[in-house]
Amino acid sequence: MEFSFVFGASAIGVAFAMFLTRQILSKSNGTTEMQKVSDAIKEGAEAFLSRQNRTIFYLAILTATLIFILYGFARATNEHDPVTNPVQLGLWIMLSFLLGAACSVVSGYIGMWIAIRTNIRTAAGALTSLNEALVIALRGGAATGFLVVTLCILGIAGLFTVINAVGATSVEKIPLLIAGFGFGASFVALFAQLGGGIYTKAADVGADLVGKVEAGIPEDDPRNPAVIADLVGDNVGDCAGRGADIFESMAAENIGAMIIASALYVGNQSAFESAGVGILGVLLFPLIVNAFGMIASLVGVLIVKTDGNENPMNALNRGYYVSTGLTALGFFVACKWFLGPFWLNFFLCGIVGLVTALIFVYLTQYYTEYAYRPVRSIATASLTGPATNVIGGIAVGMESAALPVLTISAAIITAYFLGQSSGLKDAGLFGTAVATLGMLGTAAYILAMDNFGPITDNAGGIVEMSEQPESVREKTDKLDAMGNTTKALTKGYAVGSAGLAAFLLFSAYLDELRNYGSPLESVDLSKPEVFIGGMLGAMLVFLFSSFAIRAVGSAAQSVIGEVRRQFASLKRLASGDIEFTKDFKPDYRACVDIVTAAALREMVLPGALVVLMPIVVGVLFKFIYTANGGEGAKGSEVVAGLLMVGTIAGILMALFLNNTGGAWDNAKKFVESGNFKDEKGVVHRKKSDAHKAAVVGDT
């Protein structure tokens, strides 16, 4: 029955995604001028993703081979292993890694494929009405969201079914064999987000600084040689990268929850059996609640609509509230159905996760929408120049990390104690796992909102480049400003769910040490080696961020140099703006090629850093521990310190960078909206000094 429900719900998800895709493709694809712009975006996005996936393929094969060797030949076996034959263990872990990596690549490609076909239809929809464009953009994002969530559920459930069918191990140990699926998904997501992120921001910086600030031309102006690269970046970074990111989050957290569920059932087997609760229901509980959440999100997507007078963000929020409410109902049914008399506390844990997700959405909107104080304060700071804009943005970003951390902390402690008081032994971790599942319950709708951002951004670019009427651009600008907020809140949502999951994964690391014969009940930071490990973890976050930002800067410099080269033959007016001649034809392909090569080149070093650092630290301090005759901290304890402090620092850094970027972007949009007034009542618009300062902050 459990498998029937999981696979049945997945079939509904696939059918709905196909329905949405066919509905979108049946819409008008606009004028001939629109189609020319769209074709250029398609070509650039597909070329980049093809080259990026080829690079990831080689890295994944190398890593999979290393995993097989380590598990099959280098690692000593123990009685807790799911299979006794080490070669068989290595083979299953390697295969699950490759399947997770492949599904993650497909998730990213799906996101990009649908987005580059939805953006032109959103632009064409804006010719009709704001509501038409809104519905097309959201449903395009939803098609991606449902396919990604379904692919995750099907991948894990399918692998579970195959291993169970061949009898490779007992049912309760199957989650240990599919752990590689989550690692494969994380591996691909890391490089997909790095490559896509570097591409996106480098193209954006190059297009804005030379186009808006130096040349004095509008955003997405067809005379800007970097504008196509900028629009391509929205697809490969925000659509493909985020699709792989959400897939990775769901995969890792579902598998982690299944492993914890297995341990919970084994430790409380008599209590479960006396209550008539079967092991499959407990093990597959994470997939079941995800399936309920997907169906709930389906309803949320279908009810979204607006009129010309309403703030379109209200329509998106309505859909999210409906999805959240129906997901809570799904949690109730799943807990009552599969957890027997222990259902109430775990249902409340799921509600904790859903409420946490809601709070994260509210907080991100508060810090990134220009309807609220933080973004407006940055716009006000722009009146005195770029320096004060940057100072104000950094201050807002730092402030924005406080309340989310308090929210995560409250969610972890509440869910843990609800689990502990459920009547089952050692159920605190499972309570936290269920809260994490609650946060991910509306993942399909959240991913729809995330993809809404780059789709509307591209639609605005297509409208501008095809020289549509100003009234059409006003509609896409309104949707684009919303998209900046939805992108930011989705990233905040991902950080929040990762924060809850980090607690689970760290506990899983300690369990693995216990199974391997090196139990570690606590991490003692008073030991100098462990303290050093913690400092190295925090350093890793800053070093990784430095490499990523430097990569963006390096790639952006190349783009800026190319755009300036193409503008060099043009005259400048007394105002400093460039005077364009009728025969000037920008070379879009040159900028696309430059930023593609730079992104693929620059993504390897930061990616390798985060993969190799824990291994190097563990091996180094293991050698030091052995050389000291067993005195001091073991290498595994030092790595625990690195993971613990590194995770905490990473959460804070992610919140800071995400909200700062979203706030700067919408501060610029606020100035461009024509509603920004200084204390004297003077309106500041595009091309004003305040706008130029806001553009610097945005880039």
Regions found by a protein language model. Give the residues of each.
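Hydrophobic packing and interface segments
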Residues: 1-699
